[in-house]
């Protein structure tokens, strides 16, 4: 059995290819079930996001299995095999394990340390379980990766500090204005950037948010996903909203400025306004910054914040890698211990058979009335004794890192208890 991951990501494939192989969340269990039926696939799980499509597998034979999985992906998504192969990456054994942990920790994301991917990894395991694609190995692998992702976020500061322009705008507003819960925020634009702005504003405590967009319907659809009754209006009403705003964020695709000196005429003299223009081309005319009660920040101002935070996060990567190596060792100890499982199961089965036979003899001697009254207690007692006697030897067998020492112990166990010699699975070459 070999652990492998085969897939593509923002590092290996352009969006045109990624969108062609993307699998909607609701379809993942079906794809998992179909892939699981391939002859060389013992277990599988599919991680599909806007930035990656990765198939985690336990293969009976790595060479034939990888060909089988690649062919399955190409045929099921209607992509020519040579086209797909140009963008695929393959990782085996320890590299595959470490890759999933890096993904869960956000170290392989466009935005270093971003938190959404951990939830997506959790969902991947859940969807694979629905499709009956995962068993002992991948369940343990995902459990370890999720633990690693949680530890990285709780034990380091990798997830702090803005590393996107939209989050940098909100962070700068928070620094300069203080708490956002009483700030009147105006977001102009309901595209992806506008959605991110609203998301970051809500995360930082803002509650008074109005969204403007050319299409009122699109603005309404965008705010609906947040489950809040946020007001929406059209960009044509921008002038009306300027005097009742403390913070304005612009992020439309307009080719000409939306906010000019003329449209700022409604600004009150006693009003202090901060504007964050994160659009390219810019949505706010340069001369607006000349107004005494206006502070204007554009993308270039915000990039400095982004780069400072990115450099800081990069320093955190070494600390994160140390955590991942600890989790990797933990998983590899578990994986190596699988070699002992068949012998352990056989021993447990033999001991349990003896326990049941002797229990039956004892109860028959005690008489029907006593047996019926106390059978449950005696059964629990004998079961507890067996479990306690076997516990330490079983733990020590699994924990033995020296492969040859473990195999000698297994052979001794088989000889002493007259067990059949097991064809134990070989651990991967690490």
From Swiss-Prot:
InterPro entries: 4pyrrol_synth_GluRdtase, 4pyrrol_synth_GluRdtase_dimer, 4pyrrol_synth_GluRdtase_N, GluRdtase_CS, GluRdtase_dimer_dom_sf, GluRdtase_N_sf, NAD(P)-bd_dom_sf, Shikm_DH/Glu-tRNA_Rdtase. PROSITE patterns: GLUTR (PS00747). Transmembrane segments: none annotated. Substrate binds at residues 49-52, 109, 114-116, 120. The active site is at 50 (nucleophile). GO terms for molecular function: glutamyl-tRNA reductase activity; NADP binding. Its EC number is 1.2.1.70. It is an enzyme of class 1 (oxidoreductase). The record marks 99 as: Important for activity. Homodimer. Possesses an unusual extended V-shaped dimeric structure with each monomer consisting of three distinct domains arranged along a curved 'spinal' alpha-helix. The N-terminal catalytic domain specifically recognizes the glutamate moiety of the substrate. The second domain is the NADPH-binding domain, and the third C-terminal domain is responsible for dimerization. This is Glutamyl-tRNA reductase.
């Amino acid at each position: 059995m070999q652990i492998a991951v085969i897939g593509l990501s923002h590092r290996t494939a352009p969006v045109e290819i990624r969108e062609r192989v993307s699998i909607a969340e609701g379809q993942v269990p079906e794809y998992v079930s179909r892939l699981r039926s391939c002859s060389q696939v013992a277990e599988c799980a599919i991680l599909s996001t806007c930035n990656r499509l990765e198939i985690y597998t336990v293969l009976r034979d790595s060479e034939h299995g990888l060909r089988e999985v690649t062919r399955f992906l190409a045929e099921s998504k209607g992509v020519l095999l040579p086209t797909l192969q140009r963008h695929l990456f393959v990782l085996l054994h320890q590299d595959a394990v470490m890759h999933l942990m890096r993904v869960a920790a956000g170290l392989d994301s466009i935005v270093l340390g971003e938190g959404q991917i951990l939830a997506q990894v959790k969902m991947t395991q859940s969807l694979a379980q629905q499709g009956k694609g995962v068993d002992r190995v991948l369940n343990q692998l995902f459990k370890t990766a999720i633990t690693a992702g949680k530890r990285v976020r709780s034990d380091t500061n990798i997830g702090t500090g803005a590393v996107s322009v939209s989050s940098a705008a909100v962070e700068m507003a928070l620094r300069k204005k203080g708490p956002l819960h009483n700030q009147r925020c105006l977001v102009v634009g309901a595209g992806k950037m506008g959605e991110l702005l609203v998301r970051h504003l809500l995360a930082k405590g803002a509650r008074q948010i109005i969204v403007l967009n050319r299409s009122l319907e699109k603005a309404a659809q965008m705010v609906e996903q947040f489950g809040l009754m946020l007001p929406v209006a059209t960009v044509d009403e921008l002038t009306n909203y300027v005097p009742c705003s403390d913070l304005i964020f612009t992020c439309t695709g307009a080719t000409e400025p939306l906010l000019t000196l003329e449209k700022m005429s409604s600004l009150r003299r006693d009003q202090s306004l901060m504007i964050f223009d994160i659009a390219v081309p810019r949505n706010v005319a340069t001369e607006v910054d000349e107004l005494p009660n206006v502070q204007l920040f554009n993308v270039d101002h915000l990039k400095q914040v982004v780069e400072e935070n990115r450099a800081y996060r990069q320093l955190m990567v070494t600390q994160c890698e140390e955590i991942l190596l600890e989790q990797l060792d933990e998983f590899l100890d578990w994986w190596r211990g699988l070699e002992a499982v068949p012998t352990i199961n056989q021993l447990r089965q033999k001991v349990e058979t003896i326990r049941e036979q002797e229990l039956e003899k004892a109860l028959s001697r005690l008489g029907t009335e006593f047996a019926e009254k106390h059978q449950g207690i005696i059964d629990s007692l004998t079961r507890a004794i067996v479990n306690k006697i076997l516990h330490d030897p079983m733990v020590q067998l699994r924990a033995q890192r020296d492969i040859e020492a473990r195999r000698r112990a297994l052979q001794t166990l088989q000889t002493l208890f007259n067990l059949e010699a097991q064809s134990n699975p070989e651990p991967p070459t690490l």
